[in-house]
């Protein structure tokens, strides 16, 4: 289970940089308040659609495949605003991010349910919660530290995207633990 846990740590580390600093990045790029409000509306629409979009994948994936796919898509969503503030880029980023980020949490619950006996589900979910919390604590600090250097927030977003991509690679290494109990 260690690869899935490491992948989820990187999710916590990477996704939170996007959520913490996206408004600041968009403002730096000259995006106005109206478009930022639209950004959040579109992100929310993606969240509403996400469970419908990913339910089948979460039911079928027994190892870390779902976590890997979702982390990889989040890495792409995090990279997109680095390349500009064109309305289509911003829309693509927020829609992809919204359609994906909460399903990562669901992917860990699905992994636990597919791989551990019911008596161990609480402990399994607790382990994922702990590594996620650690990532959420460390992620904004590193993103902010990177953003304080040359390249500003773009560099911070590159760091977040790299963490998410690493999380995808780590999760992909996670094989099913055995038959569900």
Pin down the residues of each PLM region.
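A membrane-interface helix-boundary motif in multi-pass transporters
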Residues: 145-163
